[in-house]
Curated annotation (Swiss-Prot):
Disordered: region residues: 272-322
Family, per entry: Belongs to the Mg-chelatase subunits D/I family.
One Gene Ontology MF term: ATP binding
UniProt catalytic activity: protoporphyrin IX + Mg(2+) + ATP + H2O = Mg-protoporphyrin IX + ADP + phosphate + 3 H(+)
Biased composition (Acidic residues): 296-322
Domain of life where this protein originates: Bacteria
Gene: bchD
Pathway: Porphyrin-containing compound metabolism; bacteriochlorophyll biosynthesis
Binding residue positions for ATP: S33, T34, V35, G36, S37, G38, K39, S40
Protein name from the UniProt record: Magnesium-chelatase 67 kDa subunit
Annotated transmembrane regions: none
Alphabetized UniProt keyword annotations: ATP-binding, Bacteriochlorophyll biosynthesis, Chlorophyll biosynthesis, Ligase, Nucleotide-binding, Photosynthesis
Enzyme Commission number(s) from the entry: 6.6.1.1
Domain (VWFA) ranges: 432-620
Species per Swiss-Prot/TrEMBL record: Chlorobaculum tepidum (strain ATCC 49652 / DSM 12025 / NBRC 103806 / TLS)
């Protein structure tokens, strides 16, 4: 295994891990990067620089709830005749490190338990008559590939440092990596370097409580967080602690500008939702000033000083009339009144579910243990207490029967096949909302601002319920997946904010892309899926246009047949739908309502719609 000091490059990530070693109250370090970048090797090597005896526990992705938080050790309990408690992975990481590779793929139930443990510093085990509290105060180190999906925001909120980095591409560095792996390392030199580094970190831990930071520096970090659009006071505290930890690592008693810059780089910038605009310097302003002009007649001067929108309106109209020109229109989302429960209403129309339990389903493998039922050992996890209770009344008769047969049994209990009880769990199977936003030229003429606002409000509703979202835009010749299924609502909003518009309306491509995304999600265990289509419903680009330049033209009947065939297939597949119509009344020919009918979904008219009107329409 490669040691921490032998790893080439990745300086920022190594520095982040060293800060965590100095101040465990930073919560943890998350390292997102592509496959083969060395992130997992670095994370595992983190154990080298921790104090001797510090637990370093790796969490498998397929961990069960019993192994994660602990419970009754069935084998030991049956052998001893007394209940034996088994500690889970989280409590084994107490005062140490919990490492998770492919963090974004970790089961949502496991993520919830980790979040709870990080908040409490302990794990509460309550199951099968057992109620215990196990200490679980640990640092979390996670690595993942962003292409696999995003890490749950609630978990990232509890982790101080996020360090994205790219694979080493410098020739000399890559040659050094190859030589290191293929050659012979001097183990003695490596151990000397590790001892030295552990000594530096130990000294920094002692120095940590002697480092001071001024009110002005704290104010600067907070103002930076605000300007970057970073929300939450917890992040401010993480940034302050990171700056202090770096000062301690460098054996300083006061935080300086370098410490503040590093804290911003590791804590604030990765969480930024916007980037502040740089103010032009005096030289740039001087260069931008127009040269002095000769005096002109007043009327002519007034014409030249007219607002750009008015002065260039004729030119703009001429450009809009050019058919070969695709105009990019960037618009900001604005508030739109849509009911908070619009998603719940439409889900209820497909599948009746109790409030607060959206997407929950019973299974034999994972989730919260709710009850037991008769079954075979191979079909699930044995419910120990119910099994023992079922077997207890028959012990005397079973032992007597064995005695008649001349069988001597030393077993404390004789458990029959009919006594076995299997655990039943309730787990959130997950709800995926696939937002399909029409970004064609016709949308730009209608209500793109309101459409973006509508999606933003629906995204917020999905965030509250911890659902997954996917964002698909369709314009030009085909649809494009801007965001694969993810719990990162913030990322979806960022993609939405910069969504360009223009070109044709490949409605059939949008339906096909959404359907393929839904199929992939189902293969990963997501059972409830909903389409949210923001469109005027006026498709004019056939499916083949993305592959065949000659297929851009099709008759209205052919286009309608494509859309109808896909819509009916999607409805037959049990996917719920909402169609939000953005068309103006005087232009509408009823395309969006027809689309909603073919999908078997709910229809809402966006312009001028009020929340109560949409709710009434959904319930009617």
């Amino acid at each position: 295994m490669i040691a921490f000091t032998d790893i080439v490059g990745m300086d920022l990530a190594k520095q982040a891990l060293m800060l965590l070693a100095v101040d465990p109250s930073l919560g943890g370090v998350v390292i997102p990067s592509t496959v083969g970048s060395g992130k997992s090797t670095l994370a595992r090597a983190f154990a080298d620089i921790l104090p001797e005896g510090t637990p370093f526990v790796e969490l498998p992705l397929n961990v069960t709830e019993d192994r994660l938080i602990g419970g009754v050790d069935l084998e030991a309990t049956l052998a001893s005749g007394q209940r034996v408690v088994q500690h889970g992975v989280l409590s084994k990481a107490h005062k140490g490190v919990l490492y998770v590779d492919s963090l974004s793929l970790l089961d949502s139930s496991a993520v919830s338990h980790i979040m709870d443990a990080m908040s409490r510093g302990a794990v509460i085990v309550e199951r099968e008559g057992l109620s215990e509290v196990h200490p679980a105060d640990f640092m979390l180190v996670g690595t993942y590939d962003p292409s696999d999906g995003e890490v749950r925001m609630g978990l990232l909120d509890r982790i101080g440092i996020i360090v994205p980095f790219t694979p080493v591409n410098d020739y000399r560095a890559r040659k050094q990596i190859v030589s290191l792996v293929m050659g012979t390392r001097n183990e003695e030199d490596t151990q000397d370097e590790l001892r030295m580094l552990r000594g530096i970190i130990g000294a920094a831990r002692e120095q940590l409580h002697h480092v001071s930071i001024t009110n002005e520096q704290i104010k600067g970090l907070i103002q930076t967080a605000i300007s970057l659009g970073v929300e939450g006071n917890r992040v401010d505290i993480f940034a302050i602690r990171a700056a202090i930890a770096n000062a301690a690592l460098n054996q300083r008693t006061e935080v300086d500008d370098e410490d503040l810059k590093l804290a911003m780089k590791l804590v604030l910038v990765p969480r930024a939702t916007r980037m502040p605009e740089r103010e032009p310097n005096p030289e740039e302003m001087a260069q931008d000033e127009p040269p002095p002009q000769e005096e002109q007649p007043q009327d002519e001067a007034e014409d030249q000083n007219a607002p750009p929108d008015e002065a260039d309106s004729d030119a703009d109209e001429e450009q809009e009339e050019t058919p070969d020109m695709i105009e990019e229109l960037m618009m900001d989302a604005v508030e739109t009144e849509l009911p908070d429960n619009i998603l719940n209403i439409s889900l209820a129309s497909k599948k009746k579910a109790k409030s607060g339990s959206r997407g929950e389903a019973l299974n034999n493998k994972r989730g919260r243990f709710v009850r037991s039922q008769p079954g075979e050992i191979k079909s699930g996890k044995v419910a120990l207490i119910p099994t023992l209770i079922s077997a207890a009344p028959w012990q005397a008769s079973r032992k007597a029967e064995q005695a008649k047969k001349g069988i001597k049994s030393t077993a404390a209990l004789i458990i029959g096949k009919d006594d076995i009880k299997i655990k039943r769990f309730r787990d959130k199977s997950g709800t995926l909302f696939i937002f399909m936003v029409d970004a064609s030229g016709s949308m730009a003429l209608n209500r793109m601002r309101q459409a973006k606002g509508a999606v933003a409000s629906l995204l917020q509703n999905a965030y509250v319920h911890r659902d997954q979202v996917s964002l698909i835009s369709f314009r030009g010749k085909q649809a494009q997946v801007l965001l694969p299924p993810s719990q990162s609502v913030d990322r979806a909003k960022r993609e939405l904010d910069v969504l360009p518009t223009g070109g044709g309306t490949p409605l059939a491509s949008a339906l096909l892309t959404g359907w393929e995304t839904a199929k992939q999600a189902r293969a990963k265990g997501i059972t409830q899926i909903m389409f949210v289509m923001i469109t005027d419903g006026r498709g004019n680009i056939p499916l083949g246009a993305a592959y065949d330049p000659n297929a851009t033209k099709a008759s209205k009947e052919e286009l309608e047949k494509e859309v109808e065939a896909l819509a009916l297939s999607i409805q037959a597949d049990g996917i719920a739908s909402i169609v939000v119509d953005t068309q103006m009344n005087y232009l509408s020919r009823g395309e969006a309502p027809k689309l909603a009918q073919k999908l078997g979904g709910r229809y809402f008219y966006l312009p001028n719609a009020k929340a109560e009107q949409i709710v009434e329409a959904a319930l009617s």
